[in-house]
């Protein structure tokens, strides 16, 4: 749980922004969304595998695009 100490004479919106940023860095909202509903382990693995495949395809596309620009 992120802890924010409000500095003296610090506006509330600035402190709130710092708190939101620290929550984002800690990954709290992503964790809450992930735990909102149960996901079967097979579905979770399938989703993770699909995202890995997509990442790999993106990486290959970037490398191919870079190669074509070199010539």
Curated annotation (Swiss-Prot):
The keyword Iron does not apply. Keywords: Ribonucleoprotein, Ribosomal protein. Residues 46-59 have a biased composition (Basic residues). Residues 38-71 are annotated as: Disordered. GO terms for biological process: translation. InterPro entries: Ribosomal_bS21 (IPR001911), Ribosomal_bS21_CS (IPR018278), Ribosomal_bS21_sf (IPR038380). Belongs to the bacterial ribosomal protein bS21 family. The keyword RNA-binding does not apply. Residues 60-71 have a biased composition (Basic and acidic residues). It comes from the Bacteria. Pfam families: Ribosomal_S21. GO terms for cellular component: ribonucleoprotein complex; ribosome. It comes from Hamiltonella defensa subsp. Acyrthosiphon pisum (strain 5AT). This is Small ribosomal subunit protein bS21. Signal peptide: none annotated. One of its GO terms (molecular function) is structural constituent of ribosome. PANTHER family: MITOCHONDRIAL 28S RIBOSOMAL PROTEIN S21 (PTHR21109), SMALL RIBOSOMAL SUBUNIT PROTEIN BS21 (PTHR21109:SF22).
